[in-house]
């Protein structure tokens, strides 16, 4: 597979996912970029904005296994990872694997689980491995977490610590669809038959595991010349000296942004990254990795606004 064929494959995958998820083209793109980059996504949005449908549709189009965990305050690490259960027939312990042993894991309302459970998922995200009763178990190379949180209800939640937020390649903000898209969705849901059909929406599995590995090999070969790497570093360093930011982005953030730029370039059929790639991915890659200063918060500024100001201020290579 060459870059042209890969670009066409990704365009077809976008189309398949779009059969079920309408009006979220930019979000679909960023989820696919994260998946091919080997990262994870944190999705923030109100209930009823197709977050679960998005995860299920991506898994269907990519022919990957899918599991969902509803995070609650009483969820324990064993409920996520799995437990060793004693078998009285052979007097041995046997591992009962938890839902983390999958390809695409939807961690629904992740901020409702206590920190102990969140940290168990953190190891899986970071190392693609889990430890159960002192024994390490590997997860698949395609393991991908799409975690959601509700920005409206914050009572009884456990905010994700900075270390865990930093493990997400992107933080995506999902909003309600526009008027025309909402009408189209309601039209599609007009009958019960169409509602049941929406569960799979006729999505064809287009990407085999071999094709996924082949695509990642193409991405690894994408060139980022010194001017692009310097531009990424300058943008990240600018977050550390901005008056509106209390804590700026880390070196890991720069590395994550560079990885995402390579994927976006490959999606466009290019073997090189452009400043446009960096600018398009800057906000979703960094909005969860900076902490605004108290004065900026009092003035009503948002991470997105501050990052856009930095993007406008730092000169892009020509």
Spans of model-derived segments:
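AAA+/SF3 P-loop NTPase mechanochemical coupling elements
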Residues: 94-103, 132-149, 160-169, 173, ...
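C-terminal engagement/docking regions of AAA+ P-loop ATPases
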Residues: 4, 239-318
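Pre-Walker A (pre-P-loop) alpha-helix and adjacent loop at the N terminus of AAA/AAA+ ATPase modules
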Residues: 3-46
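AAA+/P-loop NTPase substrate/partner-engagement loops
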Residues: 61-89
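Conserved alpha-helical scaffold flanking the Walker A/P-loop in AAA+ ATPase domains
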Residues: 30-33, 86-106
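Conserved AAA+/SF3 P-loop NTPase catalytic/coupling segment centered on the Walker-B
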Residues: 99-126, 155-165, 176-185
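Walker A/P-loop
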Residues: 35-72
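Conserved AAA+ ATPase core "coupling" helix
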Residues: 77, 81, 157-222, 230, ...
